[in-house]
Swiss-Prot record:
InterPro entries: ClpP/crotonase-like_dom_sf (IPR029045), PD40 (IPR011659), PDZ_sf (IPR036034), Tail-specific_protease (IPR005151), Tricorn_C1 (IPR028204), Tricorn_PDZ (IPR029414), Tricorn_protease (IPR012393), WD40/YVTN_repeat-like_dom_sf (IPR015943). Residues 432-498, 1149-1171 are annotated as: Disordered. One of its GO terms (molecular function) is serine-type peptidase activity. Pfam families: PD40, PDZ_Tricorn, Peptidase_S41, Tricorn_C1. Substrate binds at A1002, G1003, G1004, G1079, M1080, T1081. One of its GO terms (biological process) is proteolysis. The active site is at H827, S1051, E1109. PANTHER family: TRICORN PROTEASE HOMOLOG 2-RELATED. Belongs to the peptidase S41B family. The gene is tri2. It comes from the Bacteria. This is Putative tricorn protease homolog 2. Residues 444-456, 466-498 have a biased composition (Low complexity). Its EC number is 3.4.21.-.
Amino acid sequence: MRGARKSMGRVSYLRLPHLSGDQLCFVAEDDLWLASLDGPGRAWRLTVDRTKAGPPRFSPDGRHIAYTSWRTLVPEVHLVPVDGGPGRQLTHWGGLDTRVCGWSPPDPDGTTAVLAVASHGEPFSHLTWAYKVTPDGDPGRKLPWGPVTDIQAADLDGERRTLLLTGTPPHEPAAWKRYRGGATGRLWLHGERLLPDLGGHLSAPMFVGGRIAFLSDHEGVGNLYSCAQDGTGLRRHTDHDAFYARNAASDGTRVVYQCAGDLWIVDDLAPGSAPRRLDVRLSGPRAGRRTHQVPAAQHVGGISVDETGRASAVVVRGSLYWLTHRDGPARTIADTPGVRVRLPEMLGESGRIAYVTDAEGEDAVEISYLPRATGGRAARRLASGRLGRVLELVSDPAGDRLAVASHDGRLLILDVAEPDTEVTLALEAVDAGYPPDAGDEDAAGTAARADSAPDAPAEDTDARDIAAGTGTGDIADADAAAGGTVTPGSPGTPATAGGQVTELIRSVNGPVRDLAFSPDGTWLTWSHPGIGRTLRQIKMARIDGPEGTLVVDVTNGRFEDENPVFTRDGRYLAFLSWRGFDPVYDVHTGDLSFPLGCRPYLVPLSSATPSPFALNPEGRPAAGGLDPLEDEPGEGGAVMVEVEGLESRVTPFPVTASKYSALEPVAGGGLVWLRWPISGALGETFANPADPSERPTLEHFNLAKAKKSELVDHLDWFRVSGDGSRLVVLDEGELRAVPASEVGDGDSTTWIDLRRILHEVDPAAEWRQAYDEAGRLIRAYFWDPGMCGIDWDAVLDQYRPLLERVASPDEFADLLREVLGELGTSHAYVVAARRNEGPAHYQRWQGLLGANLACRDGRWLVRRILPGDSSDSKARSPLAGTGIRDGAVLTHVDGRPVDPVLGPSPLLAGAGGTTVELTFAPAEGCQGPSRRVAVVPLVDERPLRYQDWVAKRREVVRELSGGRCGYLHIPDMGGSGWAQFNRDLRMEVSRPALIVDVRGNAGGHISELVIEKLTRTILGWDLTRDAQPVSYTSNAPRGPVVAVADEATSSDGDMITAAFKLLRLGPVVGQRTWGGVVGMTGRHRLGDGSVITVPMNAAWFDAYGWSVENYGVAPDVEALRTPLDWAEGRYPVLDEAVRLALELLETNPPATPPGYEAVPDRSRPPLPPRE
């Protein structure tokens, strides 16, 4: 019994501990818990928020705990009494990175304050400043030390000392293990830097027993270390060699931390100290692991519509259901906890459906029979482990073959033909333990013969256990060595048909996609990747023919051709192609681009088949379109392909060039597709960013009449029924079935009630499945086939036991981050799933006013309304244009008085994005009545704060350089970064020198475009009378260029810094960059809703090799703005950059236009005399 009790102590995932006296506080199951340190005993819940919680910290007197909670959508500081009772929310900052760090020591009068860091009021989320927040709930006082990620304070030798941690990465150390880039962290004690050459992560700094303690992985694994206050005497106090020590905290003499789901304590920092594990057991039912129902409409993962459009197979959170469209019940097809079903595909009119399952740990195809009134049939499982990661699954019209696109570039044909029906039915009956239908004498005889066979195999208990939850009867393990299916109860015995896998073709440049069969099932077409991973070509393959398989190139690979489909009469092949080259002039820089490059194209498969868009010597029929054929082939007829001249028969549809996707053939010889509006990358094209005009339109094209019509004005996606007569449309979580060739009305539109699907989630089983699937995704997509020497299976085995402790989506995400952290590679991210439980109250965003307010004698004054930028719609203060001036006093919000201590922020809780009324009294010394204004508070102030931040730094550069240096800041390498770069480029390059600031650059993919602009050279000038000369090339730097980078310059920011140095554009000033250049492509949603990214694309440079990853790019000149520089208002980094630029100007003067002194003489020369 004692052993059983001991094991019970480690069934929970314990995190984020702190201690005070004999009490221990920690986070588990998304709540705070308290436990006694004296010995084993049950912990008790302190909060019941059931939502993500941050690190808790006891107050110095041990009576309260400050912690970070996500109860209000974003993290805010909360305070809860240790003895129980309601907690209080202390901050209403609305930032994304708020975190409690600790408490300040008591002042002589006994008062103390919470120490927290937050990006509130900053332009970037990584710029977290330290704040002191008093327990009475004032908005907090910003401390002057600049951006910090942790702060501790203590009274040492009669003096208040501050310990700061700066320059850390955006990830926790365990999420990128053995990170050695430029953002490993800098430790400061009272302005002096400690341990500058440690060479590993620094985190969790603490004052402990007269020493400085911290966590570091500079020796390969995260452990607890300490040093003297001058940085000498480094000691290691723990010896974890497999799992990282994480999230350490101290009461000043002892240290507690988490490791592998357990809590550990180090009683002192003596040289021989050793950690001990704390025996902590939780009380309660572990509610986060209990089964619960989820709304199907929020978890639709795929749909396949039946032949006539009367019902669909619907994937809901990894399970498959059969749902009639109008009335009728929902029926389970496949629903096994811990098994994920994907990519359902109807097998023609055979009454069967195929889908991908991972029931055996690898992708396999399972074939189930659709529900019938006579009862179910056993499912068959095929090709387990031989398909790779299945990306697409398409059936031929007869339902005998599946085309499979695998992650590794293989295009496979899987035989799913029906085995001998009588034998299969009989064996199913015997295996199920009941006799076959007595009315079927042939079946009964077959069953008797099978049952009496001398070598009949024994019952397969394992297979029966696997099938227990499917709702469709037993599943036969069909992954036999012979490649075929096996009958139930007969493991390893091939069935009469099915299961053979044939590789049709293999791409060497990424996966094939967009598979489609011809109406007769003889031909298969797809989009094949080409040069540079952007070009694609259309290919076709004749699968059945007297000469075997024949692969044909329909297009030549010069363009991006995708989404090929056969028309339902088999006469044409249609596809989408990005081959339009009608350039559009850029209104700002004069560049040209091709935003209207896509159209649908049509290929007559025979030269004898007329193009519906071609001219006819006899003219067109009165109704337009084509003349009816005397021998109309109809749908599903034999497809005749004349290979010669296919490429020359490619013809564009007579529709406007735009952005198209999801091309599909429908009944009546028509086609449908989605047409997307041309909009900007930042969503500012439309007056209202939430306008549905940003969503696609579903259009139908009638080939016979060469006419286009609109079916649905906006939607998310759609699926086509087997006969092409109906479409199932998903629109903002609602499903409806509509006609495929005309606009639906009240009678022809069927709204599909997803509430009939009652899906129950087993969180523990989902997490086990999601964990294994994440492991397979990493194995399949990680950039190095050899996993950079990592034994990935061993890593998965090491962390797998911790799954049984997890009890919330956030805990599962935390565990998964530890696992992916073992890759030691950038861009391995995990986003937690949204839980379906949490606080019962209504959640909305904090409202922000885009202004700096200050409290003076209990009155809240508008100190400064941020000016913003009229070229950025998101960078506008709600108070701009209201007539409110600096100095006005905010007295009421929606008629409620502003508290003199708390300020207006609590009254703006939940007001983000909605209209509120603000009442202002005149500024001090001004007369007049109060004013009421209506404004819409912001949800996110960062764009507004960012423009103000850039303007201030430009002013600094102007002042330091005497106006000779231009200044550009690039916040990222995406749409917003490109916009910001070009917003000020023309003005700033006109100055003699240029400072290009990429500090804090969040990365992206456009560094090449920025480099192209910066490498322009002035070769000459264009002079116009009464106007200033213009350089050729235009918008080129006139003189020296200096780059500024820091440890937050990341990803594509690393790339542009490397390119800047390799191209010798100019010196780089600052700090070594982040060091993360193994990029990701897309995001993978797991079965539980978690999202992971896989490092897929590794950057290599001639000069640096692979070394930029996990190291970064070192500057030419190091410069650092220390906490004291921030406190005293100095700009040493910009100062150094400007100094270098001015020095370079002395030796490399800027390009200047010529004057009119040496213009050519074009006057008429005198006529020379005759000779």
